[in-house]
Curated annotation (Swiss-Prot):
CDD domains: S4 (cd00165). GO terms for biological process: ribosomal small subunit biogenesis; translation. It comes from the Archaea. Part of the 30S ribosomal subunit. Contacts protein S5. The interaction surface between S4 and S5 is involved in control of translational fidelity. One of the primary rRNA binding proteins, it binds directly to 16S rRNA where it nucleates assembly of the body of the 30S subunit. With S5 and S12 plays an important role in translational accuracy. This is Small ribosomal subunit protein uS4. Gene3D superfamilies: RNA-binding S4 domain. The keyword Cell wall biogenesis/degradation does not apply. The gene is rps4. Residues 158-178 are annotated as: Disordered. It comes from Methanococcus maripaludis (strain C6 / ATCC BAA-1332). SMART domains: Ribosomal_S4 (SM01390), S4 (SM00363).
């Protein structure tokens, strides 16, 4: 029939490819959060850039529609716990950094909860299908976890990792279940 539509890129690359300071910062963030390549980091940076761009647009928009859009933006950011203030303002959105989004990735949360020993191991568990969110297997490490799903992250019941005495399971999880 027809050709499938061409999907656009979900990220913007840096303007200049060889800035040593930026490369060093990206390397540190990639190691801290277990990112495989820079494209993953650039996707999250682009998402943050879009939130900040929307906030800048809404600062100048004083109509009722602008107020509604600001509330919708706050609700999205609160749903994913990217914005944690009780009474958020657009200045809070402008002050967000890349780590506030990276902390909400499934890979990071699995590591922080103690389901994996390292961030890279958390990624492997997710990709291999050992992690479930709300009882559904999720195989995307970049999946943004909402606040409602935060407590529903666990091993898939029929996974070998669900066994208490699996050698790769962390001691923190084994003690928690006893």
């Amino acid at each position: 029939m027809g050709d499938p539509r061409r999907l656009g890129k979900k990220y913007d690359t840096p303007n200049h490819p060889w800035i040593g300071e930026r490369i060093q910062k990206e390397r540190e963030i990639s190691q801290k959060y277990g990112l495989v390549n820079k494209k993953e980091l650039w996707k999250m940076e682009t998402q943050l850039r879009n939130y900040r761009r929307q906030a800048r647009k809404l600062i100048s928009d004083t109509t009722t529609q602008g107020g509604k859009e600001a509330v919708q933006l706050f609700n999205v950011l609160k749903r994913y716990a990217i914005l944690v203030e009780q009474e958020p303002t657009l200045d809070h959105v402008l002050s967000l950094d890349i780590e506030s989004i990276l902390e909400r990735r499934l890979q990071t949360i699995v590591y922080r909860k103690g389901l994996a020993k390292t961030a890279k191991q958390a990624r492997q568990f997710i990709v291999h299908g050992h992690i479930a969110v709300n009882g559904k297997r999720v195989t995307a490490p970049a999946y943004l976890v909402s606040v409602a799903e935060n407590d529903a992250i666990e091993y898939v019941p029929n996974s070998p990792m669900a066994s208490e005495n699996h050698p790769e399971r962390t001691a923190a999880v084994s003690e928690e279940n006893q």
